[in-house]
Amino acid sequence: MITASEPLFYIHLSFYTAPRMCYTSFQGCDEMNIDEQKTRFLGICRETIHREGLEELLDWLLKADFFTAPASTRYHGAYAGGLCEHSLDVYDYARKLAFLSPTALSEESLAIAALFHDVCKVNFYTTEYRNKKIDGVWQEIPFYTVDERYHFGGHGSKSVYQIQYFMKLTPEEAAAINCHMGFSDGNMGTVRDVSDAYEQYPLAWIVHVADEAATFLLER
């Protein structure tokens, strides 16, 4: 358990030392970095999460594009491997913020909510090409675009649905994933609804802040 009495706790060293090599648009992480991210992601899941259905969920992610997909088309993590990288960044930030919770947090629940909050983006992006003149020569330049094949209506709610196809979530985990975008998610109902979720489930607020920090401070 992660408790409020722990002012600092172990955070994976890669939170501080992992190289940021992927910021040029569509440049992508090199294959070694993507493999390292995959190894770390799977390792955390198998060491921390002990729940029926985990291996089926991981098998789906391995067969899909989770480990090579971008986190967005043009903003944070808009490069190959960006989605997995972002998920790990949110996990690291959430662990760093967990001491703020007034009640002890389950390390398993924190890992589930942070690492899987964006699985709605699996098989969500595709690559297209546009012409761009570079040094006087027209070239085809690849770029990411959205190819939504399953319209669910909500970002976080889609992740909750997809996870629970394989593995059950607690109400706290479901709320944390569903509300991770905070008040910017137009499908979340009223501002009061989100505030109530954060008040009832500290993990939901922590994952939201971790997601914002990873997006706007680390991955720009």
Enumerate the language-model features and the residues they cover.
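Histidine-centered, transition-metal-coordinating active-site segments
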Residues: 26-51, 93, 98-99, 203-220
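Divalent metal-dependent catalytic cores for phosphoryl transfer on phosphate-bearing substrates
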Residues: 77, 85, 97-220
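Conserved hydrophobic/aromatic pocket- or pore-lining residues that grip, position, or stack substrates
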Residues: 90
